[in-house]
Amino acid sequence: MNGLLHGLLYGLPIITVVLTATALGLWFERKFAARIQSRKGPTMVGPAGILQPLADVLKMLQKEQIAPAAADRFLFELAPILCGACAVAIAAVVPFSPTVIAADIDVGVLYVLAVNALILIPVWMGGWASNNKFALIGAMRAVAQSVSYSVPMVLSALVPVILAGSMSLSDIVRYQSEHHWFALWPTIPGLPAFVLFFLSSLAEANRIPFDIPEAESELIAGITTEYTGMKFGLFYMAEYIHTLIASAVASVLFLGGWDGPLYPGLHWMVIKTLLLFASIYWVRWSLLRFRTDQLMMLCWKWLVPASLLLVMAAAMYVKAGGM
């Protein structure tokens, strides 16, 4: 009972913060994209349009909930709920500061990678249950892409695990703090591992240039083709949460988390996460989409061998007494 109460006391604020941050991230992306395209972006709802995401949610809640006549209704309704839940669940083990963390477990890295893989289940459910060929093809592409890019993601995440000697995210941050992570990057495979993890995160979150599962010119809207209203909104929200949490996890694994000059704390974690979040959308609005063959060749021909070399380099660095 005490464990359940502890989880609720720490989990509910984390969920609230994640959802609020996702809404602000959506507003930020629109303003950021508008700047790139010489537009103004949202301006009408709230100061500088900051309440536009809230208006979008209210609009989606009022829309009619439609399901195809031949769809598997139970799985069709369940898929967006599970997709959103899996995306939020990853935030439970992310240490935003030494004290702001819902669950500081010893296998935090394993938990993050495992829950990230679970998102494939509701994605496939949504595509199959829709009884729509475009949704099914989008789901198949999403599964193939995620399974492929999970390999370099896992291998690149092993680099800080090997260096820190722990799978706890908090321990990895403390290791980086003790060894001055910004000074060690030139001497260990941290920087290339960060680049590989970042690219894999883009692919896992279906962000441009890796968004072939929902390529509008080919698949209308991918797995969300038949979804309307808030069910569509849950899939949409899950993508943004996934992107935000991926930025936070990358900050913890490779950028020192809450550690920083002068006064380490939550503010450094927020700054690093926002910078990565902004860079993801800078890439999105600057590059074109890969073809399927190019995407798979990049993964298996370049990223997987490079990540294997980095794991071996990290092990050799530790063996040579680099810790």
Annotate each language-model stretch with its function.
Residues 1-323:
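Selective transmembrane helix interface/packing segments
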